[in-house]
């Protein structure tokens, strides 16, 4: 991975608190998953996290309208799209880490921020998902529902 500078912040609060303080909720956190693969295959680490997350929430990959997967390496995206049958029209639609950078410690909130802005540009979006893998084989996925 290259080394990039960047920062991001995500404001998380109870829906009632947001409304009482003049904020309009956009994304509602539903669930998250942390899974692992053998450390020799870190590019595949988001796959079991995504699979477990959507199964536990009784969804399919087709139910997810927008997906962000951190692409520190292009082979990670190839493996994930092939194994999960993700169409490129729903994946990293605002550009991924190879295009925009991959600042360590900020990538997760950057992906969620991109999803936040993208759901405001589009109609009929119900579920969005972000996932990231680590060099040690750990994959993390998070699922949000769009607040209407």
What are these model-predicted stretches?
Residues 1-148:
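Claisen-condensing/thiolase-fold acyl-transfer catalytic domains that form or cleave C-C bonds
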């Amino acid at each position: 991975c290259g080394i990039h500078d960047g920062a991001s912040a995500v404001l998380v609060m109870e829906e009632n608190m947001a409304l009482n303080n003049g904020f309009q909720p956009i994304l509602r956190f539903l669930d998250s998953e942390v899974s692992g693969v053998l450390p020799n295959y870190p590019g595949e680490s988001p796959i079991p996290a995504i699979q477990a997350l959507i199964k536990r929430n009784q969804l399919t990959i087709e139910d997810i309208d927008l997906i962000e997967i951190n692409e520190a390496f292009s082979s990670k995206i190839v493996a994930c799209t092939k194994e999960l049958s993700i169409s490129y029209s729903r994946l990293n639609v605002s550009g991924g880490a190879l295009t925009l950078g991959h600042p360590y410690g900020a990538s997760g909130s950057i992906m969620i921020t991109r999803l936040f802005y993208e759901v405001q540009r589009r109609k009929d979006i119900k579920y969005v998902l972000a996932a990231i893998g680590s060099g040690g084989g750990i994959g993390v996925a998070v699922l949000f529902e769009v607040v209407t």
